[in-house]
Protein backbone atom coordinates (compact mmCIF):
# COMPACT_ATOMS: atom_id res chain seq x y z
CA UNK A 1 0.00 0.00 0.00
CA UNK A 2 1.08 3.64 0.04
CA UNK A 3 0.65 6.63 2.33
CA UNK A 4 0.94 10.40 2.59
CA UNK A 5 4.74 10.27 2.59
CA UNK A 6 4.66 8.48 -0.77
CA UNK A 7 2.40 11.18 -2.20
CA UNK A 8 4.60 13.97 -0.88
CA UNK A 9 7.65 12.24 -2.35
CA UNK A 10 5.80 11.95 -5.64
CA UNK A 11 5.20 15.68 -5.68
CA UNK A 12 8.91 16.39 -5.32
CA UNK A 13 9.71 13.83 -7.99
CA UNK A 14 7.34 15.25 -10.62
CA UNK A 15 7.92 18.92 -9.74
CA UNK A 16 8.47 20.88 -12.93
CA UNK A 17 7.03 18.09 -15.05
CA UNK A 18 3.34 18.78 -14.36
CA UNK A 19 1.19 21.81 -13.65
CA UNK A 20 -0.28 22.82 -10.32
CA UNK A 21 -3.84 23.21 -11.56
CA UNK A 22 -6.21 25.94 -10.33
CA UNK A 23 -8.92 25.51 -7.70
CA UNK A 24 -11.61 28.08 -8.44
CA UNK A 25 -14.92 28.92 -6.81
CA UNK A 26 -18.16 28.91 -8.80
CA UNK A 27 -20.85 31.33 -7.74
CA UNK A 28 -23.39 29.78 -10.10
CA UNK A 29 -22.84 26.20 -8.97
CA UNK A 30 -22.76 27.29 -5.33
CA UNK A 31 -26.14 28.93 -5.74
CA UNK A 32 -27.59 25.84 -7.38
CA UNK A 33 -26.22 23.42 -4.76
CA UNK A 34 -26.78 25.56 -1.67
CA UNK A 35 -23.13 25.13 -0.65
CA UNK A 36 -19.78 26.65 -1.59
CA UNK A 37 -18.61 24.85 -4.73
CA UNK A 38 -15.04 24.80 -6.01
CA UNK A 39 -13.72 23.30 -9.23
CA UNK A 40 -10.33 21.58 -9.32
CA UNK A 41 -9.44 22.20 -12.95
CA UNK A 42 -7.31 19.16 -13.66
CA UNK A 43 -8.53 19.27 -17.26
CA UNK A 44 -5.91 22.03 -17.70
CA UNK A 45 -3.15 19.54 -16.83
CA UNK A 46 -0.60 18.52 -19.46
CA UNK A 47 -2.24 16.05 -21.90
CA UNK A 48 -5.65 17.20 -20.67
CA UNK A 49 -6.05 15.04 -17.57
CA UNK A 50 -4.58 14.05 -14.20
CA UNK A 51 -3.06 10.89 -15.64
CA UNK A 52 0.32 12.42 -16.42
CA UNK A 53 1.03 12.81 -12.68
CA UNK A 54 1.03 9.08 -12.11
CA UNK A 55 2.85 8.29 -15.33
CA UNK A 56 5.71 10.63 -14.47
CA UNK A 57 5.96 9.39 -10.90
CA UNK A 58 6.21 5.81 -12.15
CA UNK A 59 8.89 6.36 -14.76
CA UNK A 60 10.95 8.81 -12.69
CA UNK A 61 10.97 6.33 -9.80
CA UNK A 62 12.82 3.83 -11.96
CA UNK A 63 16.60 4.09 -12.31
CA UNK A 64 17.53 4.67 -15.93
CA UNK A 65 18.99 1.19 -16.25
CA UNK A 66 15.68 -0.31 -15.06
CA UNK A 67 13.44 1.40 -17.62
CA UNK A 68 13.98 -1.34 -20.15
CA UNK A 69 13.46 -0.85 -23.86
CA UNK A 70 10.73 1.71 -23.25
CA UNK A 71 7.25 2.08 -21.76
CA UNK A 72 4.19 0.03 -22.67
CA UNK A 73 0.65 0.56 -21.43
CA UNK A 74 -2.97 -0.36 -22.02
CA UNK A 75 -5.45 2.48 -22.39
CA UNK A 76 -8.45 3.59 -24.38
CA UNK A 77 -8.18 7.13 -23.10
CA UNK A 78 -6.19 9.55 -21.02
CA UNK A 79 -3.58 7.14 -19.64
CA UNK A 80 -2.43 6.52 -23.20
CA UNK A 81 -1.55 10.15 -23.79
CA UNK A 82 0.02 10.48 -20.35
CA UNK A 83 2.39 7.55 -20.79
CA UNK A 84 3.27 8.61 -24.33
CA UNK A 85 4.02 12.15 -23.17
CA UNK A 86 6.02 11.06 -20.12
CA UNK A 87 8.07 8.68 -22.24
CA UNK A 88 8.84 11.39 -24.77
CA UNK A 89 10.00 13.74 -22.02
CA UNK A 90 12.52 11.27 -20.60
CA UNK A 91 13.75 10.09 -23.99
CA UNK A 92 12.07 6.68 -24.08
CA UNK A 93 10.01 5.05 -26.83
CA UNK A 94 6.49 3.96 -25.93
CA UNK A 95 3.92 1.47 -27.15
CA UNK A 96 0.26 1.94 -26.25
CA UNK A 97 -2.18 -0.93 -26.75
CA UNK A 98 -5.69 0.41 -27.34
CA UNK A 99 -9.11 -1.12 -28.08
CA UNK A 100 -10.18 -0.70 -31.70
CA UNK A 101 -13.21 1.35 -30.63
CA UNK A 102 -11.04 4.01 -29.00
CA UNK A 103 -12.14 7.47 -30.26
CA UNK A 104 -9.97 8.85 -33.03
CA UNK A 105 -8.95 11.94 -31.03
CA UNK A 106 -7.33 9.74 -28.36
CA UNK A 107 -5.49 7.64 -30.94
CA UNK A 108 -4.27 10.71 -32.84
CA UNK A 109 -3.14 12.51 -29.69
CA UNK A 110 -1.28 9.45 -28.44
CA UNK A 111 0.55 9.09 -31.73
CA UNK A 112 1.20 12.82 -31.63
CA UNK A 113 3.21 12.34 -28.45
CA UNK A 114 5.40 9.84 -30.28
CA UNK A 115 3.91 6.52 -29.22
CA UNK A 116 3.42 3.48 -31.40
CA UNK A 117 -0.27 2.55 -31.14
CA UNK A 118 -1.33 -1.10 -31.35
CA UNK A 119 -5.08 -1.63 -31.80
CA UNK A 120 -6.79 -4.79 -30.52
CA UNK A 121 -10.48 -5.83 -30.57
CA UNK A 122 -11.14 -5.66 -26.79
CA UNK A 123 -9.53 -4.19 -23.70
CA UNK A 124 -9.17 -7.66 -22.16
CA UNK A 125 -7.00 -8.64 -25.12
CA UNK A 126 -4.97 -5.47 -24.67
CA UNK A 127 -3.77 -6.59 -21.25
CA UNK A 128 -2.73 -9.93 -22.72
CA UNK A 129 -0.90 -8.14 -25.52
CA UNK A 130 1.34 -6.11 -23.23
CA UNK A 131 2.54 -9.29 -21.54
CA UNK A 132 4.40 -9.99 -24.77
CA UNK A 133 6.14 -6.63 -24.56
CA UNK A 134 7.00 -7.15 -20.89
CA UNK A 135 8.67 -10.46 -21.74
CA UNK A 136 10.63 -8.62 -24.42
CA UNK A 137 12.05 -6.11 -21.94
CA UNK A 138 9.53 -3.27 -22.00
CA UNK A 139 8.39 -1.60 -18.75
CA UNK A 140 4.62 -1.57 -18.29
CA UNK A 141 2.79 1.33 -16.63
CA UNK A 142 -0.54 0.16 -15.24
CA UNK A 143 -3.36 2.72 -15.50
CA UNK A 144 -4.35 2.41 -11.84
CA UNK A 145 -3.14 -0.68 -9.95
CA UNK A 146 0.33 0.57 -9.04
CA UNK A 147 1.24 2.38 -5.79
CA UNK A 148 3.61 4.70 -7.67
CA UNK A 149 0.89 5.67 -10.14
CA UNK A 150 -1.62 6.18 -7.32
CA UNK A 151 0.85 8.29 -5.35
CA UNK A 152 1.34 10.52 -8.38
CA UNK A 153 -2.41 10.95 -8.79
CA UNK A 154 -2.66 11.71 -5.07
CA UNK A 155 -0.78 14.97 -5.57
CA UNK A 156 -4.12 16.39 -6.72
CA UNK A 157 -5.38 15.82 -3.18
CA UNK A 158 -2.39 17.64 -1.68
CA UNK A 159 -3.13 20.69 -3.80
CA UNK A 160 -6.82 20.69 -2.88
CA UNK A 161 -6.17 20.72 0.87
CA UNK A 162 -3.38 23.29 0.59
CA UNK A 163 -5.58 25.64 -1.43
CA UNK A 164 -8.72 25.00 0.64
CA UNK A 165 -7.72 23.80 4.13
CA UNK A 166 -11.33 23.80 5.36
CA UNK A 167 -12.61 21.59 2.54
CA UNK A 168 -15.50 19.46 3.79
CA UNK A 169 -16.27 17.34 0.72
CA UNK A 170 -14.42 16.17 -2.38
CA UNK A 171 -16.29 14.56 -5.28
CA UNK A 172 -14.14 12.38 -7.54
CA UNK A 173 -14.98 10.10 -10.46
CA UNK A 174 -13.81 6.48 -10.57
CA UNK A 175 -12.46 4.31 -13.38
CA UNK A 176 -10.19 1.62 -11.99
CA UNK A 177 -10.00 3.42 -8.67
CA UNK A 178 -6.37 4.54 -8.64
CA UNK A 179 -7.15 8.25 -8.93
CA UNK A 180 -9.69 8.37 -6.13
CA UNK A 181 -7.45 6.15 -3.99
CA UNK A 182 -4.61 8.64 -4.30
CA UNK A 183 -6.76 11.72 -3.81
CA UNK A 184 -8.62 10.21 -0.85
CA UNK A 185 -5.39 9.12 0.84
CA UNK A 186 -4.00 12.64 0.61
CA UNK A 187 -7.19 14.44 1.61
CA UNK A 188 -8.07 12.15 4.54
CA UNK A 189 -4.48 12.17 5.82
CA UNK A 190 -4.35 15.97 5.89
CA UNK A 191 -7.98 16.63 6.84
CA UNK A 192 -9.54 13.55 8.46
CA UNK A 193 -12.96 15.19 8.79
CA UNK A 194 -13.25 15.81 5.05
CA UNK A 195 -15.51 13.41 3.16
CA UNK A 196 -14.64 11.86 -0.18
CA UNK A 197 -17.49 10.85 -2.49
CA UNK A 198 -17.01 8.57 -5.48
CA UNK A 199 -18.87 8.81 -8.79
CA UNK A 200 -19.40 6.35 -11.63
CA UNK A 201 -21.62 6.41 -14.67
CA UNK A 202 -24.08 3.65 -15.46
CA UNK A 203 -22.37 1.13 -17.71
CA UNK A 204 -18.92 1.90 -16.24
CA UNK A 205 -19.59 0.87 -12.66
CA UNK A 206 -16.79 -1.53 -11.76
CA UNK A 207 -16.30 -0.02 -8.29
CA UNK A 208 -20.00 -0.02 -7.40
CA UNK A 209 -20.25 -3.68 -8.34
CA UNK A 210 -17.07 -4.51 -6.43
CA UNK A 211 -18.28 -2.76 -3.29
CA UNK A 212 -21.59 -4.63 -3.49
CA UNK A 213 -19.89 -7.99 -4.04
CA UNK A 214 -17.01 -7.44 -1.63
CA UNK A 215 -14.45 -8.27 -4.32
CA UNK A 216 -13.49 -7.03 -7.81
CA UNK A 217 -16.03 -7.88 -10.51
CA UNK A 218 -15.20 -8.18 -14.21
CA UNK A 219 -17.58 -6.13 -16.38
CA UNK A 220 -18.75 -7.83 -19.56
CA UNK A 221 -18.68 -4.55 -21.49
CA UNK A 222 -18.40 -0.80 -20.99
CA UNK A 223 -21.62 0.78 -22.23
CA UNK A 224 -21.32 4.30 -20.78
CA UNK A 225 -20.38 7.29 -22.92
CA UNK A 226 -17.83 8.11 -20.21
CA UNK A 227 -15.26 5.89 -21.91
CA UNK A 228 -12.39 7.14 -19.77
CA UNK A 229 -14.10 5.58 -16.74
CA UNK A 230 -14.20 2.28 -18.60
CA UNK A 231 -11.97 0.00 -16.55
CA UNK A 232 -13.17 -3.60 -16.93
CA UNK A 233 -12.62 -4.10 -13.19
CA UNK A 234 -11.07 -2.48 -10.15
CA UNK A 235 -8.23 -4.15 -8.24
CA UNK A 236 -8.04 -5.61 -4.76
CA UNK A 237 -5.83 -2.66 -3.81
CA UNK A 238 -8.12 0.09 -5.09
CA UNK A 239 -11.19 -1.65 -3.69
CA UNK A 240 -9.60 -1.79 -0.23
CA UNK A 241 -8.82 1.93 -0.32
CA UNK A 242 -12.35 2.73 -1.48
CA UNK A 243 -13.76 0.71 1.41
CA UNK A 244 -11.45 2.55 3.79
CA UNK A 245 -11.95 6.13 2.66
CA UNK A 246 -15.12 6.68 0.63
CA UNK A 247 -18.48 7.76 2.00
CA UNK A 248 -20.27 6.18 -0.95
CA UNK A 249 -20.20 5.81 -4.72
CA UNK A 250 -22.98 7.57 -6.62
CA UNK A 251 -24.10 6.06 -9.92
CA UNK A 252 -25.03 8.67 -12.53
CA UNK A 253 -26.92 8.06 -15.81
CA UNK A 254 -25.18 9.20 -18.98
CA UNK A 255 -27.95 11.73 -19.60
CA UNK A 256 -27.19 13.47 -16.30
CA UNK A 257 -23.46 13.50 -17.02
CA UNK A 258 -24.12 15.16 -20.38
CA UNK A 259 -26.53 17.67 -18.87
CA UNK A 260 -23.84 18.53 -16.35
CA UNK A 261 -21.27 18.85 -19.14
CA UNK A 262 -23.49 21.39 -20.89
CA UNK A 263 -24.01 23.38 -17.71
CA UNK A 264 -20.29 23.47 -16.91
CA UNK A 265 -19.58 24.69 -20.43
CA UNK A 266 -22.30 27.34 -20.43
CA UNK A 267 -21.93 28.66 -16.88
CA UNK A 268 -18.42 27.74 -15.70
CA UNK A 269 -16.86 28.14 -19.17
CA UNK A 270 -14.97 24.84 -19.04
CA UNK A 271 -15.31 22.00 -21.55
CA UNK A 272 -14.99 18.72 -19.70
CA UNK A 273 -15.42 15.11 -20.70
CA UNK A 274 -18.35 13.10 -19.25
CA UNK A 275 -15.97 11.36 -16.83
CA UNK A 276 -15.43 14.76 -15.21
CA UNK A 277 -18.84 16.39 -15.57
CA UNK A 278 -20.45 13.46 -13.77
CA UNK A 279 -19.08 14.92 -10.52
CA UNK A 280 -21.54 17.81 -10.79
CA UNK A 281 -24.38 15.40 -11.55
CA UNK A 282 -23.43 13.39 -8.47
CA UNK A 283 -23.16 16.49 -6.28
CA UNK A 284 -26.77 17.33 -7.07
CA UNK A 285 -27.83 13.83 -6.06
CA UNK A 286 -25.85 14.25 -2.83
CA UNK A 287 -27.24 17.69 -1.97
CA UNK A 288 -28.97 16.43 1.19
CA UNK A 289 -25.51 15.76 2.65
CA UNK A 290 -24.39 19.38 2.17
CA UNK A 291 -25.25 22.62 3.95
CA UNK A 292 -24.57 26.31 3.44
CA UNK A 293 -21.33 25.87 5.40
CA UNK A 294 -20.09 23.02 3.19
CA UNK A 295 -16.99 23.55 1.06
CA UNK A 296 -17.45 21.13 -1.84
CA UNK A 297 -14.71 20.44 -4.37
CA UNK A 298 -15.58 18.86 -7.71
CA UNK A 299 -12.51 17.33 -9.33
CA UNK A 300 -12.80 17.93 -13.07
CA UNK A 301 -10.35 15.20 -13.97
CA UNK A 302 -10.13 15.67 -17.73
CA UNK A 303 -11.29 17.50 -20.82
CA UNK A 304 -10.35 15.19 -23.67
CA UNK A 305 -13.57 15.11 -25.64
CA UNK A 306 -13.70 15.40 -29.41
CA UNK A 307 -15.96 17.88 -31.17
CA UNK A 308 -17.44 14.89 -33.01
CA UNK A 309 -18.42 13.16 -29.77
CA UNK A 310 -19.64 16.40 -28.22
CA UNK A 311 -22.01 17.02 -31.12
CA UNK A 312 -23.18 13.40 -31.17
CA UNK A 313 -23.91 13.34 -27.44
CA UNK A 314 -25.94 16.54 -27.67
CA UNK A 315 -28.25 15.24 -30.40
Each language-model region and where it sits:
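PLP-dependent amino-acid enzyme catalytic core
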Residues: 1-315
Amino acid sequence: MFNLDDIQNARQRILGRVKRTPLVSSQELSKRLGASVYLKLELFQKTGSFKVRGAFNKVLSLPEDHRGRGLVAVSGGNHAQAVAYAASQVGLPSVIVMPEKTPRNYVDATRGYGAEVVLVPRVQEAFREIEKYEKDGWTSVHPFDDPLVMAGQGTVGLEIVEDLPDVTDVVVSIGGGGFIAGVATAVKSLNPSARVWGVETEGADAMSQALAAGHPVQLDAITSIARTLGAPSVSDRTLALAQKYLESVTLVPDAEAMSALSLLLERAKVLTEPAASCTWAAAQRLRSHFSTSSQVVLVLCGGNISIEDLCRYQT
